[in-house]
Amino acid sequence: MNKQKVCPACESAELIYDPERGEIVCAKCGYVIEENIIDMGPEWRAFDASQRERRSRTGAPESILLHDKGLSTEIGIDRSLSGLMREKMYRLRKWQSRLRVSDAAERNLAFALSELDRITAQLKLPRHVEEEAARLYREAVRKGLIRGRSIESVMAACVYAACRLLKVPRTLDEIADIARVDKKEIGRSYRFIARNLNLTPKKLFVKPTDYVNKFADELGLSEKVRRRAIEILDEAYKRGLTSGKSPAGLVAAALYIASLLEGEKRTQREVAEVARVTEVTVRNRYKELVEKLKIKVPIA
């Protein structure tokens, strides 16, 4: 918790800021506590929101989610104009929007970022994931990694990579369902991007436990089942049983086992559908975990 600033001379908390001199002064004894403070705000004053808007000379902050980072100018709309003037302004807006994406690279980037917006909106991903995916895509463009690959597959791969980097649990199947490309193509683009952008396995590692709450919510499982599933996964990790295995498959099997142990049974099919894996995968991971961890599962 921050301590209240006091005067070092008399310990009074009555301090005054003098914006003209850039000083903080003690109101009681006149001691100058700080000086040469730079005021980062505007030099003008405003007394309401509309006045602030009129006097402000700066636009919106830069955004990595816009192809031009939001630095271009847009021609606005004014319905009070005459019909002839409105028509003229419409033509100007049309030409101005064309100029903003005048070359192929700009058009491709604008399309890629609109695709990113669509994917992240449908997956309900947080903004920091969207921004990280945009950063990865721009870096891929800068390094010439897009050539020979579809924009959609590379952007979907960047979204998947961003999710893994920021530990936001989303499976490749979920992203492939939203993207307009095949899962295998996204997977190839993901591996290529990860290799060339130095996204090491350590950076991209997602603990299976990160998926537990997501899948358990969809299955309607209690906190008790979740805790048991996490215990199973932690033990599996300690024994090296998770290496090279799909996190989704492992979590599905752990939740299936935990649901049996805690009397909240879910079928292998139900668990497989939520995790977007096959029943065979759930069955195989289930057998491995039960056998290697010596778990005694009640017979239904």
Curated annotation (Swiss-Prot):
GO terms for biological process: transcription preinitiation complex assembly. Gene3D superfamilies: 1.10.472.170, Cyclin-like. Coiled coil: none annotated. One of its GO terms (cellular component) is transcription preinitiation complex. Keywords: Metal-binding, Repeat, Transcription, Transcription regulation, Zinc, Zinc-finger. InterPro entries: Cyclin-like_dom, Cyclin-like_sf, TFIIB, TFIIB_arc, TFIIB_CS, TFIIB_cyclin, Znf_TFIIB. A zinc finger (TFIIB-type) spans 2-34. Disulfide bonds: none annotated. It holds the Pfam family Zn_Ribbon_TF. SMART domains: CYCLIN. Sequence repeats lie at residues 114-197, 210-291. PANTHER family: TRANSCRIPTION INITIATION FACTOR IIB, TRANSCRIPTION INITIATION FACTOR IIB-RELATED. Belongs to the TFIIB family. Stabilizes TBP binding to an archaeal box-A promoter. Also responsible for recruiting RNA polymerase II to the pre-initiation complex (DNA-TBP-TFIIB). This is Transcription initiation factor IIB. It comes from Pyrococcus woesei.
